[in-house]
């Protein structure tokens, strides 16, 4: 069994999801969205993201993390804030000793849907199908779960490829 936390970072909404894989079958453990108060300073929001991710990791004990990479925003300040929120989440994972993998949004979409330009709705649908549940969660949560599923899928493929290579 392997347990992964997927994270869709954001300074206002950080989606997260824990997925277990047992014998190639994916199971949803828990998921949600971290929403720091907009009343506090930006540094307080980052601290909140760090603390919440740390608490989630301590509670659910994932051993690996998959984090969506920052897209290139048109506004440099937005990109900077998104990068800082992502950094808070990554440091929380690293602080707990998790192996961390980064994935571009197009890679996540291609892995789940089959093409890198999939809509949020298509990704959410495939997340639900992959986990055997009806997707009734926010988009940030869906994106985080998609990140975890992408990681588990790529990991499974790499493990199989390595086993085949050893036999050659």
Curated annotation (Swiss-Prot):
One of its GO terms (cellular component) is Holliday junction resolvase complex. The keyword NAD does not apply. Mg(2+) 2 binds at residue 68. Its EC number is 3.1.21.10. The keyword Nuclease applies. Binds 2 Mg(2+) ion per subunit. Belongs to the RuvC family. NCBIfam families: ruvC (TIGR00228). This is Crossover junction endodeoxyribonuclease RuvC. It comes from Lawsonia intracellularis (strain PHE/MN1-00). The gene is ruvC.
């Amino acid at each position: 069994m392997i347990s992964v936390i997927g994270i869709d970072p954001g300074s206002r909404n950080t989606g997260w999801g824990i997925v277990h894989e047992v014998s190639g079958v994916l199971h949803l453990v828990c998921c949600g969205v971290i929403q720091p108060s907009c009343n506090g300073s930006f540094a307080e929001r980052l601290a909140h993201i760090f603390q919440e991710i740390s608490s989630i990791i301590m509670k659910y004990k994932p051993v690996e993390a998959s984090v969506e990479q920052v897209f290139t925003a048109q506004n440099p300040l937005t990109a900077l804030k998104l990068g800082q929120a992502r950094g808070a989440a990554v440091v929380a994972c690293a602080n707990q000793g998790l192996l961390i993998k980064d994935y571009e949004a197009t890679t996540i979409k291609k892995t789940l849907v089959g093409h890198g330009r999939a809509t949020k709705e298509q990704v959410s649908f495939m997340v639900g199908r992959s986990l055997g549940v009806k997707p009734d969660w926010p988009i940030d949560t869906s994106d985080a779960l998609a990140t975890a599923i992408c990681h588990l899928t790529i990991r499974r493929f790499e493990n199989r490829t390595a086993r085949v290579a050893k036999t050659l």
